[in-house]
């Protein structure tokens, strides 16, 4: 007679009916309870016991195989709909609420990184999650986070673009994980601690790959940036929104260095990112008695957040409370759905799930 304990995967215990009632029997060789039913039961009952034990073994083996496949999978958990309904409380029609991890799984960030208009948006969102929201993700969402991050790194290694941006992202994530992993026993991360240590080693490997990357020059010989007129070069440099990009560009050639030091260029950059009040609080004069806009920019960047602008963003419909990418169709009953949609910055997206 098989008896299942608390662990449904166990083979059970061996019992035999005697004149005094049911008793367990201990195998003298192995020191454990076994189903040596050949001596106590009929052959039919013995075969039933073996069949029951084999079924338990098959179920346990299938579960172990499924767990192993889940731990090794590299794909994101996709959903057919590329939108999600954001609800913050229970109602008669809908119970529960939407979490950050659920939204992260449903909004198809894995495909969004392939779009140059959405790439910076997704990277900024990953950085914000790595800073403070990693513990609020579910186990599946944390796995998707690492899988998307791996695709981002592979894309940067292939395209050789946005290298510094991803370096900063990896450094932010590694610093956060160092703090979270030290909190042993507090259940701040989902999964085994050794798995997260392995992921940290993977992050270090990615950082080393980015540090060792060699920018390959294009094979064709045509018109280059330095061949353009100076006014056109300066016009293009005014489109750069990061001062560090201007400094790096000025290190390419002496002529570009002269353009990168243009006072008007740095003045427009300061006025783009910061308000007049912020600028007046951080005035810096040069040796000639003029405003040093370059030094002012980097000082302002350390004190205030810079302006963020993206080619494509997530948007929230105020009519039906559906979150989706711009241009993605969603079931909305409004007469003019486009007028009901508002764009969300990465920080607005995070704040949307703070209850």
Swiss-Prot record:
GO cellular component terms attached to this protein's record: cytoplasm; nucleus; SCF ubiquitin ligase complex
Pathway: Protein modification; protein ubiquitination
GO-annotated biological processes: protein ubiquitination; response to denervation involved in regulation of muscle adaptation
Designated name of the protein: F-box only protein 32
Motif window: Nuclear export signal: 169-173
Motif (Bipartite nuclear localization signal) on chain: 280-295
UniProt lineage: Eukaryota, Metazoa, Chordata, Craniata, Vertebrata
Complex formation: Part of the SCF (SKP1-CUL1-F-box) E3 ubiquitin-protein ligase complex SCF(FBXO32) formed of CUL1, SKP1, RBX1 and FBXO32.
Swiss-Prot/TrEMBL keywords: Cytoplasm, Nucleus, Ubl conjugation pathway
Principal location class: cytoplasm
Span(s) of short sequence motif Nuclear localization signal: 62-67
InterPro entries from the UniProt entry: F-box-like_dom_sf, F-box_dom, FBX25/32
Domain F-box positions: 223-271
Compartments, record wording: Cytoplasm; Nucleus
Role noted for this protein: Substrate recognition component of a SCF (SKP1-CUL1-F-box protein) E3 ubiquitin-protein ligase complex which mediates the ubiquitination and subsequent proteasomal degradation of target proteins. Probably recognizes and binds to phosphorylated target proteins during skeletal muscle atrophy. Recognizes TERF1.
């Amino acid at each position: 007679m098989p008896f299942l304990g608390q662990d449904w995967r166990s083979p059970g215990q061996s019992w035999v009916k005697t004149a005094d009632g049911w008793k367990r029997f201990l195998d003298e060789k192995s020191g454990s309870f076994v189903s040596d039913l050949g001596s106590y039961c009929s052959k039919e009952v013995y075969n039933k016991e073996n069949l029951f034990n084999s079924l338990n073994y098959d179920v346990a083996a299938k579960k172990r195989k499924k767990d192993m496949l889940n731990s090794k999978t590299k794909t994101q958990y996709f959903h057919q709909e590329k939108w999600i309904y954001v609800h913050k409380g229970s109602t008669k029609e809908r119970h529960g609420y939407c979490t950050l991890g659920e939204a992260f799984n449903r909004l198809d960030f894995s495909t969004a990184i392939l779009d140059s208009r959405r790439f910076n948006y997704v990277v900024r969102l990953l950085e914000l999650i790595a800073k403070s929201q990693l513990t609020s993700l579910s186990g599946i969402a944390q796995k998707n986070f690492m899988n998307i991050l791996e695709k981002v790194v592979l894309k940067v290694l292939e395209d050789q673009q946005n290298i510094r941006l991803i370096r900063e992202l990896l450094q932010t994530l590694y610093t956060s994980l160092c703090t979270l992993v030290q909190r042993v026993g507090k259940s701040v991360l989902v999964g085994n601690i050794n798995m997260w240590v392995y992921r940290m080693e993977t992050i270090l490997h990615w950082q080393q790959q980015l540090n060792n990357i060699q920018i390959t020059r294009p094979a064709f010989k045509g018109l280059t940036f330095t061949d353009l007129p100076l006014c056109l070069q300066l016009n293009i440099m005014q489109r750069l929104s990061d001062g560090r990009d201007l400094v790096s560009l000025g290190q390419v050639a002496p002529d570009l260095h002269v353009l990168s030091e243009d006072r008007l260029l740095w003045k427009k950059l300061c006025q783009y990112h910061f308000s007049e009040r912020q600028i007046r609080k951080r005035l810096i004069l040069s040796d000639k008695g003029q405003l040093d806009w370059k030094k002012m920019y980097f000082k302002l960047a350390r004190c205030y957040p810079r302006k963020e602008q993206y080619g494509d963003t997530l948007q929230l419909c105020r009519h039906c409370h559906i979150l989706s990418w711009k241009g993605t169709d969603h079931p909305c009953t409004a007469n003019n759905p486009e007028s009901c949609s508002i764009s969300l910055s990465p920080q607005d997206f995070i704040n949307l799930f703070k209850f």
